[in-house]
Amino acid sequence: GLFDIIKKIAESF
């Protein structure tokens, strides 16, 4: 879902 995408981006930082 949308939160999964947010988590993926957060791991990039």
Curated annotation (Swiss-Prot):
Residues recorded with modification Phenylalanine amide: 13
Function recorded in the entry: Antimicrobial activity against B.cereus, L.lactis, L.innocua, M.luteus, P.multocida, S.aureus, S.epidermidis and S.uberis. Probably acts by disturbing membrane functions with its amphipathic structure. Shows anticancer activity.
Source species taxonomy: Eukaryota, Metazoa, Chordata, Craniata, Vertebrata
Subcellular location: Secreted
GO CC annotation terms, alphabetical: extracellular region
Distribution of this protein across tissues and organs: Expressed by the skin dorsal glands.
Descriptive protein name: Aurein-1.2
Record keywords: Amidation, Amphibian defense peptide, Antibiotic, Antimicrobial, Secreted
Highest rank taxon of the organism: Eukaryota
